[in-house]
């Protein structure tokens, strides 16, 4: 296989095969390069990142697990890669090409990176911490590793705004005059310490009372620390687990507990327990269970007991 990004020949990936009559040369697809080889925090789950320009000229970067290579051609075609082979070809050369590149990634100078699938501490050794924006805090030997973020599809995003000085002058100074805001900030800064302290449950604080007493302001203060999204209690089981896992080692903010329904109230216990529900795959295997260690800040006009009694009829 050879990649021709440009030149006299039509750009693309070409396959050459020696035959009795000479050399059979044919184009497989448009230019397709592997920009990285990755593995997970357990040293398993290897994959590659494939880059190409789609039909409208936009550069696409797609992660493909090595266990997914057999279906790589159809996946890439669906994302806009021009493939010369007919759709559904029984023996597509695209997976073979990608596998050949993987087998020789060191010789080709392709970087090997550690894939991070969630934020927070990466192991029980507490030597590396992944921030939501992809920045890694990894002193010592771990600082020599290269990392890439690969958060689950649908995971809530985080946002970075302003500078540390602006935060200190606005939120920090205001907290000196507000007990609620100060407490909410302490809860937020405590989140990365939960695993370090070996706590089994995820603690939290619920601010309740009438309007205009600073509940939402306090919660927004918590969200400002790591750029968390200001969530609500209107959640399903599945999405709540995804949101909680995406806030591992970080504070999670849920506003207005009155929006919770009867089933949602049970999520309060699930979030505190730090573990989602066990589920089966369509093939009868066990799906990966979401886990987390976080701090929770919640708001509402009612206490959690009052809200639960209203929704479920039980205290």
Language-model region placement:
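Conserved glycine-centered beta->alpha loop in an early N-terminal alpha/beta scaffold
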Residues: 1-175, 242, 247-250
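Short loop/turn elements that form and flank the Walker-type P-loop nucleotide-binding site
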Residues: 200-201, 246-248, 290-293
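P-loop NTPase catalytic core of nucleic-acid-dependent motor ATPases
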Residues: 142-228
